[in-house]
């Protein structure tokens, strides 16, 4: 069954109609439902229209099926207002042992994304917003993205809906919690986020805690209550950098920066969470632990890639971790005290212009749609101290890779 809630302020009776059509496949069916809207219905008094979609197709990461709902508000023959929204039908659940989409366990594998671009900041059009989603899904082979640390362009979210890219979004903020007036506005921000974005099927988790902030139970009880009231279908998360933090949300989301190249890729769930019966998701890793420029030497760029691989490998080995989001998709502008002296954070697996670093191939070779074969060295001895090429890595999603040392040898045809 399909339940639609609309918000209006009316001075006299009206009729609301709703038409649903299939926008993903070639099905030409549609259904119509109508409901009388009584005088006095306001923005705070929603009314519902109900209908049934016959044999619905489910939205998932491989087949992101979408439907279109068009609603119209009529008084007699006069059309007062109309609206259109796309939506999907899916069952997304976080459990103690991981994340399940439509009943199937799915390991979340994603990156964090800022909404910034070189020179123009956030002022980029629809096409570029959508291109970032394409890069995440098609070039990097990911199934998820975290919109750190604020809700992002609807164009980006719409493309995530179309591609089947899972989204963890959160209300604005970074580390700081202000006074009571500030907190009241933050609760409003959480409410606005959910009202504006809740029809996106790609969104699987609401972030209702200021990123990396300390515990504040009275404040976060309010943000969680708002989220559960406005959208009881989705769980809440709260990104922190604190182990054994007070858990008011449905999912313990934690920035795990344990790995330094020598230490394990991540901490086990039981060492981090305050309630091991609740789901656990790693919301950030790497990033500032090993900033790497696209023009750094090969050793550093290679080490950067291997650190990302180490964390992915560690997460994959622990069945009770729902997944992880690396920090981050691309380099970005920052304030003078946080970058590399040039107001740029070189934390991305891509540079600011979305050109891939070696670490990008680590993620790309996790998918099986596009062949990936990347060598971490140019093999030029002048690039290395003492002409010693050091460790060389081959990043690939192939079942096997054969290397040949002498170019005069004939390659086997099945290599």
What are these regions (language model features)?
Residues 132-138, 144-355, 359, 363-392:
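Substrate-binding/catalytic cleft of secreted carbohydrate-active enzymes
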Residues 1-159, 163-167, 189, 204-205, ...:
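Secreted/periplasmic carbohydrate-active enzymes, especially glycoside hydrolases
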